[in-house]
Regions:
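OB-fold and OB-like single-stranded nucleic-acid-recognition modules
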Residues: 1-237
Length: 237
């Protein structure tokens, strides 16, 4: 790999990071708070490439730089370094989507401690009907105090995933940093035909008592209405 190729690699990688962070694409792979670090890293890589090109220009006398032994200066980089272009090419050619149903079937499910270290006090639900809840809120309430969900119509949002038996779930991924550490949150939906996998839905239903207790299994909701919706810009929690 020549010096010019290394400079090109810096430029392309930096441009990819800047392009991702300037739009919403980065939200498929990392948390929203990482936008500015991505922009800074991308800009720094482009700046390094510009500086490298400036330093590599011929001298005023037109003579190239020479190494101490009199041989022209060259860079000896392993051919494997060409693999560094692969992530950039993948982004430009494919742009992988956010994690979806296929990964949800195999991912680690978010675990709620069966016995919390401190007493869990859950606030009363709003009086709206149906009451909109995040999947994580349904999971926590079912695990620790399912009575707070009793006799209430819940509105939950997520994408459709299935398990090996064919049951379907309203699903969403939560992540701390990036897609690599994502955990899946899901609520079992019964009483209605499943939409297509990966389809985002808004489901209205009632919590099935004594499901999801202790956080070992997903809570269950008897579906009253399913509305197909567009995927949100940020598909993670």
């Amino acid at each position: 790999m020549t010096r010019a190729t290394q400079t090109l690699l810096l430029t392309v990688t930096g441009a990819v990071l800047v392009r991702m962070a300037m739009g919403d694409t980065y939200l498929r792979y990392v948390n929203s708070w990482m936008r500015w670090p991505l922009l800074a890293c991308g800009a720094l890589l482009v700046l390094l490439a510009v500086v490298d090109m400036w330093r590599d220009e011929p001298k005023a006398d037109g003579q190239p730089d020479h190494a101490p032994d009199g041989e022209p200066e060259s860079s000896h980089v392993p051919r494997a370094a060409w693999l560094l272009f692969v992530p950039s090419l993948v982004f430009f050619l494919i742009a992988p989507p956010a994690l979806g149903a296929h990964f949800a079937e195999r991912a680690q499910t978010a675990v709620v401690p069966a016995e919390p270290s401190t007493e869990v006090v859950l606030p009363e639900l709003p009086t709206t009907d149906p009451v909109p809840l995040l999947l994580e809120d349904v999971i926590i309430r079912a695990a620790y105090d399912g009575d707070t969900l009793a006799d209430r119509r819940l509105e939950i949002t997520g994408f459709v995933s299935r398990d090996a038996s064919g049951d379907w779930f309203v699903t969403q991924f939560g992540m701390n940093c990036c897609a690599a550490d994502a955990t899946v949150m899901k609520v079992l939906a019964t009483g209605a035909e499943a939409p297509a996998d990966d389809q985002w839905v808004k489901v209205v239903g009632r919590y099935v008592a004594d499901t999801g207790v202790g956080g070992g299994t997903p809570p269950e909701v008897t579906v009253e209405d399913v509305q197909l919706i567009d995927a949100p810009t940020n598909q993670y929690r």
